[in-house]
Amino acid sequence: MLKINCGSGVHPLPGWVNVDLEAGPNVDVVADLGAGIPWPDASVDYIHSEDFLSCLPRIEQVRCFLSEARRVLRPSGCMRLLLPSLERLIEAWQQRPRWLVEHWQRAVGLPLDPPTGGHLVNLALKLNPGFFFDRATLEGLVDAAGFRLREVGYNESPHEALRGLDDRRPDQTVSVYYECDPI
């Protein structure tokens, strides 16, 4: 069984091939996944991507990655995505600004002056090298690449290999958990 963890950085997954743009002590394969995935067609069982997709600086790289993921996945395979949600970020700013600021200070640690939700949203959008996805945009990109998008729960999956991988609980993040099935 071949399982690849895309953009693994300092968060490798044991038993997975950990792939990142830069070499590191826990990186098994160095590759620019925004330009292609270095595996043969239909050779990968599972793909995991935590925050990687939102770090790609150009939407063309997102399209390339999704197309390549579809190419390398077996028909019975699945790709799990965890990525920041534009909807959840804006919802938190509107409904829970104090939580958003407290979470930022705890998880990110960059100073906010003034410590407000509006300042945080602007800073988050500026600092993110890539894209904050809303569901409609992500679904359009995923559909075009040949996948069906499903929102899933924290550490939940019909695929045993994809259960228990999530690093952050829903109360600790504005991210969303998705799985993409080849169609």
Tell where the protein language model's regions lie, with residue ranges:
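Conserved SAM-binding loop
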Residues: 3-89, 178-182
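S-adenosyl-L-methionine-dependent methyltransferase catalytic module, highlighting the catalytic core
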Residues: 57-64, 68, 78-183
